[in-house]
């Protein structure tokens, strides 16, 4: 089975970038553990993640499992001989800003249209709130 990965639409772009680097299909779900799991099942994903570092590995259980995630990090440390700091240093760096704005429906629609014009429609997701990539 082809490896596939899922995170929610509020997560950073790190998983998406890493998946692209190794040619793995990547999907985003709405926020919420149940939404991530539903998306994983829909696409046959072998790994998922939901905020707060909650890995979901269906080989273990279809819910967030910090203990399983910790075991996988320890396994990676043994396999590579690297410390957690060394492993983190190899990951791409991202800045994520989460903010809220009070806008009327009309002002919101105009703002989203301007963002799509400036950034390109593919860079603006309305899946679960507004996400700019």
Q: What kind of region is each of these model predictions?
A:
Residues 1:
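Conserved PLP-enzyme active-site core in the AAT-like
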